[in-house]
A protein has these predicted regions:
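Glycine-rich phosphate/pyrophosphate-binding beta-alpha loops
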Residues: 298-300, 304-310
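N-terminal glycine-/serine-/threonine-rich beta1-alpha1-beta2 phosphate-ribose binding loop
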Residues: 1-100
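Rossmann-fold NAD(P)-binding glycine/threonine-rich loop
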Residues: 89-100, 109-147
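Rossmann-like NAD(P)H-binding beta-loop-alpha module
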Residues: 124-205, 212
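Low-complexity, glycine/alanine/valine/leucine- and proline-rich hydrophobic stretches
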Residues: 270-295, 309-310, 383, 388-399
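A short hydrophobic/small-residue beta-strand
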Residues: 104-105, 389
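A conserved regulatory-domain signal marking ACT and ACT-like small-molecule sensing domains
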Residues: 320, 324-444
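Substrate-binding/catalytic subdomain of NAD(P)-dependent oxidoreductase enzymes
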Residues: 182-282, 286-289, 308
Length: 444
């Protein structure tokens, strides 16, 4: 009887920053992993668009392919790492691999957000495995925490800084008194901004990640039309400074709230004011932080590197280890038919809250013509919508005949604030569109 270790073949599709990081660290740690897992890991090959493109990580030319389906169909490949990005070809490759019963590992949050239901169904139907820890918050094991370590909990709230680019920009603005434009220029130079900048700056990237967390926590796929998605383009250095006057910092957050008594759920991605003494307020730079509030554990906050080659490669390699254990029969299977039925049942217990039902405190900034009676017009509109003001800070701009008002409100509905802002925009005395930010007080 042979005692030869089980051979595990690995194929990587996409050899950009993350793919090269995975190959580099696997090559360095493979022997140690093999001894710990009792297997023989073979790096079968990588698939790229341009084999001749210069790359920092060098691999033998014989291990470079250009046909991803050929790599997936190679009988030696047990685990496919889909690290190419995009949602069209990546979807086709992923489904093809799963239908062959292979394990797929992905860092592709957009793909999961848009096609997760179809991909998860393919897992349950064909017996493959799908792992996606690297899709949310890079080196922070939040997906494994939701699936395993914190599985005993019903989560009333998940609040996270899950886009490192936005956090970097707001941190630089706050710490160095930089304008948004100057901070963004530096972020571009350092390679912190996606090629399609709207993914980071308009909240789309964070929305993709929040949808994944919402499904894992509550069993519900949340469409874009049922969410509040905003970026940070309208946040100014002036707002950063005024936030400190209210005892807060501005952070770009993903917020998932579940009201079990009402059967409602909300998902939002937006810049918000959070108290200076909260844990998330101290998460700066490109780091991520996620606070999860459960009925059993209370509030747990995970902080770490949310992006970058090494942090993401760490998550991918962690998934490779889980895939190997599953192939050996030493780990439980995830996304079985029973799992998906349980998620569907869980999701059916929650409906998305309406704007009238979503309550928040707000920060409101507007500039007024320096003229008698104009403030009264503003506060009349707020009163019409039932908006109670908690605090007001006013300051003048010498020689400009205008003044800026910043105020905080008591809790009021999103719908009421939306109506009030529409009315304020029509006032001739309001010199520029008002800025509205939410004020949160996370349990952390």
């Amino acid at each position: 009887m042979s005692n030869a270790p089980l051979k595990i073949g690995l194929g990587i599709i996409g050899f950009g920053t993350v793919g090269q990081g995975v190959w580099k660290h696997l090559a360095a740690t493979r022997r140690n992993m093999e001894m710990r897992l009792g297997v023989k890991i073979e790096l079968i090959g990588v698939c790229v668009r341009d084999p001749d493109k210069p790359r920092k990580v060098k691999i033998p030319r014989t291990q470079i392919l250009t046909d991803p389906f050929a790599l997936v169909q190679d009988p030696r490949v047990n685990i496919v790492c889909e690290l190419m990005g995009g949602t069209t070809l990546a979807r086709d490759i992923t489904l093809h691999a799963l239908r062959l019963g292979k394990s797929v590992i992905s860092a592709n949050k957009a793909l999961i957000c848009e096609h997760g239901m179809e991909i998860f169904a393919a897992v349950s139907q064909h017996g493959g495995q799908y792992f996606f820890e690297a899709s949310v918050a890079g080196g922070i094991p939040v997906i494994k925490s939701l699936r395993e370590g914190l599985v005993a909990n019903c989560f009333s709230e998940i609040v996270g800084i899950i886009n490192g680019t936005c956090n970097y920009l707001l941190s630089r603005m706050e710490k160095e008194s930089l304008s948004y434009e100057t901070a963004l220029k530096d972020a571009r130079r350092l390679g912190y901004v996606e090629a399609d900048e709207s993914l980071d700056l308009d909240g789309v990237d964070a929305y993709h990640k929040a949808v994944i967390l919402a499904f894992l926590a509550h069993g519900k796929w949340v469409p874009r039309k049922n969410t509040l998605v905003e970026g940070i383009r309208n946040v100014t250095l002036e707002d950063i400074r005024r936030a400190s006057d209210f005892g807060c910092k501005i952070k770009h957050l993903a917020v998932i709230h579940r009201d079990f008594s009402k059967g409602t759920m909300t998902l939002g991605v937006y810049p918000a004011l959070i108290p200076l003494d909260s844990i998330l307020a101290r998460v700066d730079g490109v780091h991520n932080g996620i606070s999860l509030t459960g009925d059993v554990v209370g509030t747990t906050t995970l902080v770490g590197r949310g992006a970058g080659q090494d942090a993401t490669a760490s998550a991918v390699i962690g998934d490779i280890v889980d895939a190997i254990r599953a192939l050996k029969g030493a780990a439980f299977k995830f996304l079985t038919t029973e799992d998906l039925e349980s998620y569907a049942t869980l999701g059916s217990t929650a409906r998305m809250a309406t704007l009238e039902e979503i309550l928040s405190r707000f920060y409101l900034r507007f500039s007024l013509r320096d003229k008698s009676g104009v403030s009264a017009e503003v506060y009349r509109i707020l009163a019409e919508e039932g908006i109670s003001v908690a605090r007001v800070i006013q300051y003048e701009h010498a020689g400009t005949q205008r003044g800026t008002h910043t105020l905080s409100t008591y809790p009021v509905s999103e719908a009421a604030m939306e109506r009030a802002v529409r009315k304020l925009r029509k006032l001739r005395s309001v010199l520029e569109p008002p800025l509205v930010l939410r004020i949160l007080a996370p349990a952390s």
